[in-house]
Amino acid sequence: MVQISNVWGFGLAIMASLAAAAPKDCPDGLCLRTRANLSPLEVSQELGPLISNASSIFGPSDSRWANATARYQQYAAPKFTVVVRVARESDVSVIIKYANRNSLPFYAVNRGHGLPISQAKFSGLEIDMQLLTGITIQSNGKSALFQGGTYDQQVMDTLWEEGYVTTTGSCGCVGMLGPALGGGHGRQQGFHGLISDNILKLNVVLADGTTATVSNTSHTDLFWAMKGAGHNFGVVTSFEMSIYPTQVHSWYYKNYVFTQDKLEDLFEQLNVLQGNGTQPVKMAAQYGIYMMDSTVSATEAIIWWTFGYAGSQSEAQQYLTPFDDLNPLSSTDGNVPFPEVPNVQGTGINNATCDKGLERIVGPAGLQVYNATAQRQIYDLFNRNVKSYPELAASAVVMEGYSVEAVRKVDSDSSAYPMRDDYLLMQTTVSYSPNSTLDNVAIDWVTENQKFWNEGQPTRKPTAYVNYASGRESLEAMYGYEPWRLERLRKLKAKYDPEGRFSYYNPIV
């Protein structure tokens, strides 16, 4: 029997008939009535005997609760009433069947970095995946099996030690699967494509608790949907994806700090470098941030920009000389093994980008080239808002440019990911300690930035990478403007999740 790790919640206010019926009359949850207000103790007594011994069930009074329920984005966060921390993949199917029998909503969580405001509609049971961190390299050395709780830094470190790499997200602290189900951008994508492009097989628990192996030979319709809209269809307990022998053993990085007077020249040179989707594959990642740095100025944001090159400084220099010539305020550089690149480029597992507990109002946009006028408008608005609301000084405007060579080689119709002609990923993140009086200010700020970006490319429709989207954007902006895309997704939703169990992450219906 699983450990019953707290006795919180004896006295939830439920009808007397239900109190009499549970848990004694429902030892395994087989009740016909709605019991969505089950306490952690009741869930432990009923579900505990059905799942593996190493799994655990706990509520808010348990010492593990804070870690299990902490969110990167505290604004509009899901509400959890009980956590089930699974130790085996097979537990997930049992949990979902139990939850369904008791009309208890469930939500799978790995690292807690989801951004959509639709998550605020959730209240119920958390399926905590963070113990499922197994990685098995297949004997042919061409793929590996990853459990659903793996995360980027762990994957980079583990594969590197064995002489391999694969596409991961750029932030070391973020789970692999969350980004993968929406596409999955990162430093290796110019070489190998998105995370989702490299997935060979998914082991999925569907809405009714049944399991399915999803690949290009099994449930092929669902395989298409899971690669770009996967949050809408199931819980992935493990997945197999392609891995690649390490070819580059040392990466060169260079980080610059620019002042605002260099803004227009900077974006002119960035447009030359990224060449409307032709950024050299070895110039794997360049991205920047508008942010406050009080050691430089108390009133004007700095423009911080980093370049990650898969090779030596001498090879990279031809691309960096134009930026050196802008006379940056400062710069730092060096060569490191690939797993250390996140740390030196500001996205490591212990960097501030991974901090949890703040309100974060977000608003993305997808671009092909930078519009310098829009970039100036966004910069000036940043300074005005921080001056008017000093509590928002931790905010950032993030602008990402990865090589897209391998991404563009994949047929756009081959998966639900619709944005292979977005070459630059924009994101405003307004960050502050929980304070509801600032919410509308923050929403107005990100909305205005989205307007600037989108008006700066008048021949294109607005797009929003689904993993960066807040949910205020249109479904077409997230899932594609071709009518057949949403039509196909909705038909598959009706087939695989007719009751809408998976409807909390930018839902398609």
Curated annotation (Swiss-Prot):
Phenotype upon gene inactivation: Abolished the production of (2S,9S)-annullatin D, but not that of (2R)-annullatin F, (2R)-annullatin G, and (2S,9S)-annullatin H.
Catalysed reactions, semicolon-separated: (2S,9S)-annullatin H + 2 A = (2S,9S)-annullatin D + 2 AH2
Domain FAD-binding PCMH-type span(s) in chain numbering: 75-246
Cofactor: FAD
Enzyme class: oxidoreductase
Domain of life of the native organism: Eukaryota
GO MF term set: FAD binding; oxidoreductase activity
Signal peptide: 1-21
Keyword Signal: yes
Cross-referenced PROSITE patterns: FAD_PCMH
Protein's UniProt keywords contain RNA-binding: no
Residues that span the membrane, as ranges: none
Keywords: FAD, Flavoprotein, Oxidoreductase, Signal
Pathway: Secondary metabolite biosynthesis
Function: Cytochrome P450 monooxygenase; part of the gene cluster that mediates the biosynthesis of annullatin D, an alkylated aromatic polyketide with a fused dihydrobenzofuran lactone ring system that exhibits potent agonistic activities toward the cannabinoid receptors. Within the pathway, anuG is responsible for the five-member lactone ring formation in (2S, 9S)-annullatin D via oxidative lactonization between the two hydroxyl groups.
Similarity-based family: Belongs to the oxygen-dependent FAD-linked oxidoreductase family.
Name the record gives this protein: FAD-linked oxidoreductase anuG
